[in-house]
Amino acid sequence: MKKILFLLVIVFGVNKTWAQGCSDAGICSINHGFQTAEKQFKNTIEVAAVYSLGEADVQYFSPYVSYTKRFNDRYSFTSKVTLSTAHGSFGTRTQLGDAFLIGNYSFKEKKNSQWSALLGFKFPFTASNLKINGYSLPLDYQSSLGTIDLFLGTNFHYRRWDFNAALQIPVINLNKNSYFKEYSGTDDFPSTNLFERKPDALWRASYSIKTPNKKITFKPNLLFIYHLGEDTYENIFSQRESIKGSDGLTVNGNWITTYYFNKQNSIELSAAVPFVVRDIRPDGLTRSFVLGILYQYSF
């Protein structure tokens, strides 16, 4: 119990600040692609809802549904669809976000350790140019970044530890955002006209703590996300311009608690806060706090 309390203090004992949250970019949440349900079940459905706080008091409600098919002990496939509602001073916007298709391969387990590899894609439902009453919106109000992305990842599991690394690479840019802060009357959000985003790299460490009856699992996570370059946009003179300070490191802490009703049904609560942030986050993924709930059913 002392170990659990100590980890809680580490994860949540921070001042309010801003960080890249686990939202549209997707790289924070693909670790579910490394996880598998009980091996006797071939199918898993997840239904989740996420509430988060963004920049300039923007609030988000982001439900999603996913389906995982296990073909055998080695191969599994996951599909996922997201929805996003953003509410703030610009108004309220609700729209489908992205579809994820992720394949996972698990290598043979050896001496309480196992490697797995992941390959996936993200497809947007919008070109990131949703408007309210005809007015262009910053990326903080968009449900997707409007890019087709490639995910490459690997995970090493040893006893109660998991270590995973991943890359998220935008391969096709469909972003048609037309927001200029010069015409918006506020400096809360940077200009992101025809936004082009650089890749992200992630490294995550997590540790699982199970109660004696194995009904509850606590899993603290530490995430290091490095944005590999400065994002760009097209300014009012039709010239491409780098967004200074948009590259660099983000460090997030995440605490997950899972309760198992039985082998087929479980519910998961998660909360995340930032420790280290980038100077500027034009992609609209700024979050001061993220709270999620997930129900999982396997059959």
Indicate where each model-derived feature is located:
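Outer-membrane beta-barrel biogenesis signature
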Residues: 18-46
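Outer membrane beta-barrel transmembrane domains
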Residues: 46, 190-299
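Transmembrane beta-strands of outer-membrane beta-barrel pores
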Residues: 49-55, 69, 81-87, 107, ...
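Outer-membrane beta-barrel translocator domains and adjoining extracellular loop/strand segments
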Residues: 58-63, 89-94, 128-136, 168, ...
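Residues that define the transmembrane beta-barrel architecture of outer-membrane proteins
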Residues: 59-63, 94-99, 113, 144-150, ...
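Transmembrane beta-barrel domains of outer membrane proteins
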Residues: 66-68, 104-106, 153-157, 164-166, ...
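Repeated loop/turn-to-beta-strand initiation elements of outer-membrane beta-barrel proteins
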Residues: 74-77, 110-115, 160-165, 213-218, ...
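Outer-membrane pore/translocation modules
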Residues: 93-195
